[in-house]
Amino acid sequence: REEKIPLFFAEEAAKRDWKHFGMIPEDTKYNQSHATIYEQDEAVGHSVRAVYMYTAMADLAATEHDEKLFDACERLWNNMTEKKMYITGGIGSTVEGEAFTKEYELPNDMAYAETCASIGLVFFAKQMLKMSKNGKYADAMERELYNGIISGMQLDGKRFFYVNPLEVNPGVSGEIFGYKHVIPERPGWYACACCPPNLVRMVTSLGRYAWDEDDDVIYSHLFIGQEARLKKADIKVVSEYPWKGHVSYSITPKTGDEFAVAIHIPGYLKSFEVTLNGMRLKENGETNADVIYSCLLYTSDAADEL
């Protein structure tokens, strides 16, 4: 046995004479146990299992300040979002094992793109933001929330999609072998009902994904209307996003300590402007797809309108 394989899984399988890792016996890629976490550089196997594990990896990297582990997370992130993700943010392109397949193999009409996988990608993105305030992670959260996740629930909250295809063909989707998982209409429930409660959990906990706060900076990741009670300030956000581009922040500092507010500017914007109490601070700012947080320094005890 090679020294670098994840020994726990191999040893337990030998003890139990049990070799089922997924759809195929000995398919260790199904549950991402084919290599150590430091050596993985391609998103493989069951997509939900994958992003949940990557979330734990990123959390551990941030907690332990483990740059090597963060580098592994970054490699997996880049492979998944640049080569294995639909334009909607959907991941996991095949029903076979609910899994990732080959790079750029993203069929519209046979897509799996499980709702739980998109939710898991938001979990992963939020943990990556702990280590690096790179705008691409917040961009991914936004893409999922407005596309890959919200499609999983009907507007009245009573019917759900487990699978989120980009193309549905009446008479083919849900009927013909290879397309039976692509259901044309949202069912009321599922025998394996992981997605509906997971989606509800996401919607009811959006606040934790919208903000981060460290010693001297408050980070706003998402343009979600809300009232946030943070350590340094109370912030009310009134948002017309995504229908209109206007978002206002009413910021009431709680202490006289100096702090900054850093607002994520989506990487796809061609331009933006920032005003403070009606005074223009930035006009026609250009965005960078990799890193863009517009920062404003606060020293006042008075409330401000941004």
Q: Over which residues does each language-model region extend?
A:
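Single conserved hydrophobic/aromatic residue that forms the stacking wall/gate
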Residues: 298-306
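Glycan-recognition and catalytic cores of secretory/periplasmic carbohydrate-active enzymes
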Residues: 1-297
